[in-house]
From Swiss-Prot:
It comes from Homo sapiens. The lineage of its organism: Eukaryota, Metazoa, Chordata, Craniata, Vertebrata. DNA template strand binds at residues 1039-1040, 1046. Belongs to the RNA polymerase beta chain family. The gene is POLR3B. RNA binds at residues 186, 213, 438, 692, 896, 904, 1019. This is DNA-directed RNA polymerase III subunit RPC2.
Length: 1133
C-alpha cells in the first residue's frame, strides 16, 4: 500500500475526483515486458533458435555424404549439438571458461559443435557419438552461455556486470556485435515503376536450397518473364503453356475476365500465336533453347533441352512456390496473379512502396549465422567427398576411415573470420556484405545498449536519395524517430524503439490446417476464374498462395480470436489488403511487432485489478497474452486496427490502446527529459552525444583491461529522471553530473556556447575523469626452438642503478604497478632472437642464438601511472603481458561538455570562486551558461529540467520528465514557492567582482551535464620542425607521427589569388622539401654532380632549387619513358 500511497500522494483532489476511470498503472506492463523480452532479447532469441532448432534443420538437409568411387561407402549425420564454452588447457584437457577470462586472455568465447555419425569402414558399419567438427562462437547471455540463469552474486564471482546487456560475441578478446540488417522481404510480389514509368513486378524467392529473383516486365504492351538463368526475356504466354496450360481461354480466365484486363493482355496472346507455339512440348523446347548453359563440374548424365526447361521452371523460377511431381497449378496461379497486379497497377498507378516498413524484414544474428554455418557445413561435406574420392581407390590395403580426415579448423576459422572481419561472403547465394559486425562501443553504458538496438540497412551511403532516409509513417512505434546519426548515414542507420520485438520463424503447419478449416479453398482445385470475382479474396501465407475465400471478414476475425486464445503463436499476423483483394497471413521471422492492449466495447481489457495482480507478482506478461488482454501487432496488421493513444480518446471504432506513448522513443532518446518540449533536431543531436558521454560502463570496469576506457570520477544520478531511465537502469550506471547552472552572460569568454566553469568546483572533483589505456606484448616460441625473452633492467656502470629508460622496471624486466611512466620509457624489456626460421642444411649454424632488443615503450605526451600488470597466456600458448595505464584529468579550457538537450559547448574560462556571482543563500554556480543558447535552439525542455531539478532538490525527491507526460510545470513551480523561492525559478544574484547586486534576476538551478570524450589534451597539435617522410622528404602527416599542417590545393589557390608569390614559394618549397638539382641547359635533363650523362659534358650544367617531390616525379616519369625537359634561359636575355 505504501507504493500506492506514494504514487497517488502527489495528486490533487480535483484529479482524484475526475470521472474517467483510467488505468493509471498500465505503464507497469513495460518492466514486465522488458523482463520477458528485454532490449537485447531479440538477438539472444534468434541465436538460441539457431543453436537449438535451425542447426538441426541444416544438418537434416545435408545429412548424407556419398562417394562416386565406392557406392558402398557413405557417411550419415544422426544428430548435432552445440556444447558449453570451454578452453583447452593442455592436450585433451578442457575446462569451462568465463567471458571475462576470454576478454583478458584475447581468446574466443566459443563452444564445440559435436555430431553423432554413422559411416562405413571397409565392410562394417560404425556409429560414433560426440565427434567434434568445429567450434561455434557463443553469444553472451544465450542459452549455451555460462551466464544464463545466474544470480547477481554469481555474476560477481564470474567478474561480469549483471546489468551488461549481453547479445554480443567475444572473438580474439574483442567484443563484436552483429548489427541487425534490414532487407526487403522475401517471397513477396512487389510492383514498382521504373524510371521511364513502365510498371513491372518482381519477386525475390528464397528457400533453404536456392535464392533467385524473378521479374515480370512489360515491353510494347506485351508481358515477359525475366530471369538471369535465361538468355533473353520469354513471353509470358509461352511460360503458361510450358507449365501445362495450353488453352488460351484458360490463361485468360486466370488473369482476369474484366474488360480492361483482357484488353491489356491481348497483345501477349497474339505474340505467342506469331511464334507458332501451341503445345507444352513446343513451349518447353522454345525455353530450352534460351537457357544459359551452366558449366557443371560433375559429369552426370546430360539432360535434353526439354527436360532442362522443365527443371528450370519447377525449381529455379519462383523457387518458393512448391512444385510436386511437375504439378504446376500453384505456380501458374502465382504467375497469373503477378501479371494481374501489373495490369491493374498500370491503370490507376497503384505501385508498392519499397520503403513501407511492412515490406521490410530484419535479419538478426541467428539468421546470418545460420546462412554462414550452412555454407561452411556444405563446404566441409564437399571436402570430405573429395577426400573420399581420392583416397578410396588408392589404398585397398588399409580401410578408409573418414574420421581421420575431418578437419575441425575449417568451420571454426570460417565462423571466427566472418565475425572478426564482418565480411559475409557466401558464394552460393552471391551474398557479399561488408561491415555486418562492429566492435561493441564501450564508451558508456548507453553507447553499448544503443549499439545492440541499431539497425543497419544495406544501402549505399554515397547516394543522396531521400526515400530510404526519410521517416516513414509505418515506422511509428517500431523505430525511434530521433535516434539516427547525422551526415551520410542519416536515416540509413536506425534504432529500435523501446517495446519493439522482432519475430523468429515458426512452423506454418497448424496455420494451414486452421485456414482450411475456416473455409479457404485449396489453390490446386481452382480453375482460375475465381480470382476476378469481386467478393473472392486470395489468401497468402508467407508469400505463397494458400487458396481463395469468399467471406474474408469471418476468416480474419476467427483467426484473431484463435490467436488471442493461444491456439496459434502470438506473433502470427493476419491482415487484409482491399486494393489487391488479398488476405496476408505471415509467420516468418524478421517482422517488427509490438504489444497493445485490446479494447473491448470501448473499454480497455486491462483493468486496475489486473495491474495490482501484476505488482504483487501473481501474474506475468505471458498471462496477459493468454487471457487476451494484450496482443502483438506487426506493421501490416496495424493498418487494419484503430489504435487509441490515450484512454479518453477511445471511441466506438477503437480496437487497441497504446500501452504507453513514451515507448515510441528508443533507448538513447528515452534519456532526454521533456523531449516533447524540444525542437526535433536537438533530440537527434543528444542521441549522438549521449553515446559519447563518459560515466560508468559496468560494475566490472576496474577488472577490465580495454584499449581505451573513459570513466568519470564521481558520476551522479540525474535529478530529473524519465521512465526509460528506470527501465534500462541507467541510474545505476550514470554518465554525468548535476551541475548548478546560472543562465547569464559573464565576461566575453562564453560566446558561441562556451561555458564558464567554477575553479573551486573543479578542485572538488567536478568533471574529473580517468583515462585508461592498455599496452600489451606477447612472447612467442619460434620453429627453431628459440623464443622471445624478457631481460632485466640495464644498470648504469658508475652508479649501479638502472638507466633512466629502465627506471620503472622490476628485476624481471616488466614495469611495476603504481610507478609513474614518462614518454619513451620502457614498459617491457623484451628481446627476440635474430634468427627465427630453421636454417638451411649445410649452412654454418651459430651455436648461441643472437638476441636483439624490441622493447615496448610508452608513447604519450603526458605521464601515466601503471594501474596493473597481468601475465597470462593466450590461445596459442604464447606468453601474454597486459599493462593498464591510468591518467587522471581535470577539466581544462577546451574540454567539451553537453547537457541532455543537444546543447554542447566547450569550456571557455575557468574562474576562481571569489569572482563568481552568488545568490543570497550563498550558492555559487558550477557553470555559467550564455542565455543566447536558448532562443534559436528552442530547447524549452532544458528550462523545464532546471525548474524540476530545483524543486526536486528542495523536496528531496526525483521528478519525472518522461516524454508526453512527466511532472507538470505548474506543480513544480508551486513546490518552489512553498520553499520560499521565486515561482519562475529566478534568483537574486550578487556579482563576485564588484559585490553589487546584478541588475536582473538570474535563472538559477541544477541541470544534468555530461562530459564528452573529446578533450583538448588528445587533440592539441603543433609543430615547428620534425620528422620527414623517407620517399618524398616532405613532413609526415598526423598528430601521432608529429606531422606538419598541410597547405592544400585550395589554400594555394587563395594565395595565388592574393598574388603573394614569395609566400607560396616559402611554404611550398623552402619550408617543405627544397632540393638542389643540376640541370643541363642543352638537353633539359637532370645531371648528377655537375655532369650531364646524356650530353657527356659539363659545359651547360647549372644548379637550381626545386621541391624534392618534383625531382622525384621527373625521375618516375623518365622510368616510364616520358621525358620531361627543363628549359632554362638567362633572365636578362
Amino acid at each position: 500500500m505504501d507504493v500506492l500511497a506514494e504514487e497517488f500522494g502527489n495528486l490533487t483532489p480535483e484529479q482524484l475526483a475526475a470521472p474517467i476511470p483510467t488505468v493509471e498503472e498500465k505503464w507497469r506492463l513495460l518492466p514486465a515486458f522488458l523482463k520477458v523480452k528485454g532490449l537485447v532479447k531479440q538477438h539472444i532469441d534468434s541465436f538460441n533458435y539457431f543453436i537449438n532448432v535451425e542447426i538441426k534443420k541444416i544438418m537434416k538437409a545435408n545429412e548424407k555424404v556419398t562417394s562416386d568411387a565406392d557406392p558402398m561407402w557413405y557417411l550419415k549425420y544422426l544428430n548435432i549439438y552445440v556444447g558449453l564454452p570451454d578452453v583447452e588447457e593442455s592436450f585433451n584437457v578442457t575446462r569451462p571458461v568465463s567471458p571475462h577470462e576470454c576478454r583478458l586472455r584475447d581468446m574466443t568465447y566459443s563452444a564445440p559443435i559435436t555430431v553423432d555419425i554413422e559411416y562405413t569402414r571397409g565392410s562394417q558399419r560404425i556409429i560414433r557419438n560426440a565427434l567434434p567438427i568445429g567450434r561455434m562462437p557463443i553469444m553472451l547471455r544465450s542459452s549455451n552461455c555460462v551466464l544464463t540463469g545466474k544470480t547477481p552474486a554469481e555474476f560477481a564471482k564470474l567478474n561480469e556486470c549483471p546489468l551488461d546487456p549481453g547479445g554480443y560475441f567475444i572473438v580474439k578478446g574483442v567484443e563484436k556485435v552483429i548489427l541487425i540488417q534490414e532487407q526487403l522481404s522475401k517471397n513477396r510480389i512487389i510492383v514498382e515503376a521504373d524510371r521511364k514509368g513502365a510498371v513491372g513486378a518482381s519477386v525475390t524467392s528464397s528457400t533453404h536450397e536456392k535464392k533467385s529473383r524473378t521479374n515480370m516486365a512489360v515491353k510494347q504492351g506485351r508481358f515477359y518473364l525475366r530471369h538471369n538463368t535465361l538468355s533473353e526475356d520469354i513471353p509470358i504466354v509461352i511460360i503458361f503453356k510450358a507449365m501445362g496450360v495450353e488453352s488460351d481461354q484458360e490463361i485468360v480466365q486466370m488473369i482476369g475476365t474484366e474488360e480492361h484486363v483482357m484488353a491489356a493482355f491481348g497483345p501477349s496472346l497474339e505474340e505467342c500465336q506469331k511464334a507458332q507455339i501451341f503445345t507444352q512440348m513446343q513451349a518447353l523446347k522454345y525455353i530450352g533453347n534460351k537457357v544459359r548453359r551452366q558449366r557443371m563440374w560433375g559429369g552426370g548424365p546430360k539432360k535434353t533441352k526439354i527436360e532442362e526447361a522443365r527443371e528450370l521452371l519447377a525449381s529455379t523460377i519462383l523457387t518458393h512456390v512448391p512444385v510436386k511431381e511437375f504439378n504446376f497449378r500453384a505456380k501458374c496461379i502465382y504467375t497469373a496473379v503477378m501479371v494481374r497486379r501489373v495490369i491493374l497497377a498500370q491503370g490507376d498507378n497503384k505501385v508498392d512502396d519499397r520503403d513501407y516498413y511492412g515490406n521490410k524484414r530484419l535479419e538478426l544474428a541467428g539468421q546470418l549465422l545460420s546462412l554462414l554455418f550452412e555454407d561452411l557445413f556444405k563446404k566441409f561435406n564437399s571436402e570430405m567427398k573429395k577426400i573420399a574420392d581420392q583416397v578410396i581407390p588408392k589404398q585397398r590395403a588399409a580401410q578408409f576411415d573418414v574420421v581421420k580426415h575431418m578437419r575441425q579448423d575449417q568451420i571454426t576459422n570460417g565462423m571466427v573470420n566472418a565475425i572478426s572481419t564482418g565480411n559475409w561472403s557466401l558464394k552460393r547465394f552471391k551474398m557479399d556484405r561488408q561491415g555486418v559486425t562492429q566492435v561493441l562501443s564501450r564508451l558508456s553504458y548507453i553507447s553499448a545498449l544503443g549499439m545492440m538496438t541499431r539497425i543497419s540497412s544495406q544501402f549505399e551511403k554515397t547516394r543522396k536519395v531521400s526515400g530510404p532516409r526519410s521517416l516513414q509513417p509505418s515506422q511509428w512505434g517500431m523505430l525511434c524517430p530521433s535516434d539516427t546519426p547525422e551526415g551520410e548515414a542519416c536515416g540509413l542507420v536506425k534504432n529500435l524503439a523501446l517495446m519493439t520485438h522482432i519475430t523468429t520463424d515458426m512452423e506454418d503447419g497448424p496455420i494451414v490446417k486452421l485456414a482450411s478449416n475456416l473455409g479457404v479453398e485449396d489453390v490446386n482445385l481452382l480453375c482460375g476464374e475465381e480470382l476476378s470475382y469481386p467478393n473472392v479474396f486470395l489468401v497468402f501465407l508467407n508469400g505463397n498462395i494458400l487458396g481463395v475465400i469468399r467471406d474474408h471478414k469471418k476468416l480474419v476475425n476467427t483467426f484473431r480470436l484463435m490467436r488471442r486464445a493461444g491456439y496459434i503463436n502470438e506473433f502470427v499476423s493476419i491482415s487484409t489488403n482491399l486494393t489487391d483483394r488479398c488476405v496476408y497471413i505471415s509467420s516468418d521471422g524478421g517482422r517488427l511487432c509490438r504489444p497493445y492492449i485490446i479494447v473491448k466495447k470501448q473499454k480497455p481489457a486491462v483493468t486496475n485489478k489486473h495491474m495490482e495482480e501484476l505488482a504483487q507478482g501473481y501474474r506475468n506478461f505471458e498471462d496477459f497474452l493468454h487471457e487476451s488482454l494484450v496482443e502483438y501487432l506487426d506493421v501490416n496488421e496495424e493498418n487494419d486496427c484503430n489504435i487509441a493513444l490515450y484512454e479518453h480518446t477511445i471511441n466506438k471504432d477503437t480496437t487497441h490502446l497504446e500501452i504507453e506513448p513514451f515507448t515510441l522513443l528508443g533507448v538513447c532518446a528515452g534519456l532526454i527529459p521533456y523531449p516533447h518540449h524540444n525542437q526535433s533536431p536537438r533530440n537527434t543531436y543528444q542521441c549522438a552525444m549521449g553515446k559519447q558521454a563518459m560515466g560508468t560502463i559496468g560494475y566490472n570496469q576496474r577488472n577490465r583491461i580495454d584499449t581505451l576506457m573513459y570513466l568519470l570520477a564521481y558520476p551522479q544520478k540525474p535529478m530529473v529522471k524519465t521512465k526509460t531511465i528506470e527501465l534500462i537502469e541507467f541510474e545505476k550506471l550514470p554518465a554525468g553530473q548535476n551541475a548548478t547552472v546560472a543562465v547569464m552572460s559573464y565576461s566575453g569568454y562564453d560566446i558561441e556556447d562556451a561555458l564558464v566553469l567554477n575553479k573551486a568546483s573543479l578542485d572538488r572533483g567536478f568533471g574529473r575523469c580517468l583515462v585508461y589505456k592498455n599496452a600489451k606484448c606477447t612472447l612467442k616460441r619460434y620453429t627453431n626452438q628459440t623464443f622471445d625473452k624478457v631481460m632485466g633492467p640495464m644498470l648504469d656502470a658508475a652508479t649501479r642503478k638502472p638507466i633512466w629508460r629502465h627506471e620503472i622496471l622490476d628485476a624481471d624486466g616488466i614495469c611495476s604497478p603504481g610507478e609513474k611512466v614518462e614518454n619513451k620509457q620502457v614498459l617491457v624489456n623484451k628481446s627476440m632472437p635474430t634468427v627465427t626460421q630453421i636454417p638451411l642444411e649445410g649452412s654454418n649454424v651459430p651455436q648461441q642464438p643472437q638476441y636483439k632488443d624490441v622493447p615496448i615503450t610508452y608513447k604519450g605526451a603526458t605521464d601515466s601511472y601503471i594501474e596493473k600488470v597481468m601475465i597470462s597466456s593466450n590461445a596459442e600458448d604464447a606468453f601474454l603481458i597486459k599493462m593498464l595505464l591510468r591518467q587522471t584529468r581535470r577539466p581544462e579550457i577546451g574540454d567539451k561538455f553537453s547537457s541532455r538537450h543537444g546543447q554542447k559547448g566547450v569550456c571557455g574560462l575557468i574562474v576562481p570562486q571569489e569572482d563568481m556571482p552568488f545568490c543570497d543563500s550563498g550558492i555559487c554556480p558550477d557553470i555559467i551558461m550564455n542565455p543566447h543558447g536558448f532562443p534559436s535552439r528552442m530547447t524549452v525542455g532544458k528550462l523545464i529540467e532546471l525548474l524540476a531539478g530545483k524543486a526536486g532538490v528542495l523536496d528531496g525527491r526525483f521528478h519525472y520528465g518522461t516524454a508526453f507526460g512527466g511532472s507538470k510545470v505548474k506543480d513544480v513551480c508551486e513546490d518552489l514557492v512553498r520553499h520560499g523561492y521565486n515561482y519562475l525559478g529566478k534568483d537574486y544574484v550578487t556579482s563576485g567582482i564588484t559585490g553589487e547586486p546584478l541588475e536582473a534576476y538570474i535563472y538559477f538551478g541544477p541541470v544534468y551535464y555530461q562530459k564528452l570524450k573529446h578533450m583538448v589534451l588528445d587533440k592539441m597539435h603543433a609543430r615547428a620542425r620534425g620528422p620527414r617522410a623517407v620517399l618524398t622528404r616532405q613532413p609526415t602527416e598526423g598528430r601521432s607521427r608529429d606531422g606538419g599542417l598541410r597547405l592544400g590545393e585550395m589554400e594555394r589557390d587563395c594565395l595565388i589569388g592574393y598574388g603573394a608569390s614569395m609566400l607560396l614559394l616559402e611554404r611550398l618549397m623552402i619550408s617543405s622539401d627544397a632540393f638542389e638539382v643540376d640541370v643541363c641547359g642543352q638537353c633539359g635533363l637532370l645531371g648528377y654532380s655537375g655532369w650531364c650523362h646524356y650530353c657527356k659534358s659539363s659545359c651547360h650544367v647549372s644548379s637550381l632549387r626545386i621541391p624534392y617531390a618534383c625531382k622525384l616525379l621527373f625521375q618516375e616519369l623518365q622510368s616510364m619513358n616520358i621525358i620531361p625537359r627543363l628549359k632554362l634561359s638567362k633572365y636578362n636575355e
